[in-house]
Amino acid sequence: MGFLKFSPFLVVSILLLYQACGLQAVPLRSTLESSPGMATLSEEEARLLAALVQNYMQMKVRELEQEEEQEAEGSSLDSPRSKRCGNLSTCMLGTYTQDLNKFHTFPQTSIGVGAPGKKRDMAKDLETNHHPYFGN
């Protein structure tokens, strides 16, 4: 009775093992020799590949030229500044002053120690209730 339960499993496993043994990881040498060379390209494919490579190289050259132009424009913009700032400390001081000014002009957020909140509002209410004569 137990043999009948395992017989389909046995048949399937034997078939799988037979198929696994039949498959080979490396193809036969005759199939490699009979197939046309995969590495060889036709004349049209070679021309297309050469055109693609040439277009890619031209695109990269244009990108590099644009980057060089942008760098040249950037250095020309900085040249009056370099003429004005003969001393490095003067330039750095000016830069830090500008950054500090930008920092102070940012809008204030309601986060942090001095932020308005429930506790501060309650404290103000207590002060106004304890000293009613200061309010008016």
Curated annotation (Swiss-Prot):
Molecular functions per Gene Ontology: calcitonin receptor binding; hormone activity; identical protein binding; neuropeptide hormone activity; protein-containing complex binding; signaling receptor binding
Record function comment: Calcitonin is a peptide hormone that causes a rapid but short-lived drop in the level of calcium and phosphate in blood by promoting the incorporation of those ions in the bones. Calcitonin function is mediated by the calcitonin receptor/CALCR and the CALCR-RAMP2 (AMYR2) receptor complex.
Residues carrying Phosphoserine: 42
PTM annotation (Proline amide): residues: 116
Stated name of the protein: Calcitonin
Pfam family, one: Calc_CGRP_IAPP
Positions with biased composition (Basic and acidic residues): 118-130
Keyword Membrane: no
Chief place of localization: secreted
Domain of life from the UniProt record: Eukaryota
Spans annotated as Disordered: 64-84, 114-136
Compartmental location: Secreted
InterPro entries from the UniProt entry: Calcitonin, Calcitonin-like, Calcitonin/adrenomedullin, Calcitonin_CS, Calcitonin_peptide-like
Residues making up the propeptide: 26-82, 121-136
Cystine pairings recorded for this chain: 85-91
Keywords: Amidation, Cleavage on pair of basic residues, Disulfide bond, Glycoprotein, Hormone, Phosphoprotein, Secreted, Signal
Taxonomic placement: Eukaryota, Metazoa, Chordata, Craniata, Vertebrata
Signal peptide: 1-25
Residue positions with a glycan: 87
Example GO BP: receptor internalization
Family: Belongs to the calcitonin family.
Cytoplasm found in the keyword field: no
GO cellular component: axon; cytoplasm; extracellular region; extracellular space; hippocampal mossy fiber to CA3 synapse; neuron projection; neuronal cell body; neuronal dense core vesicle
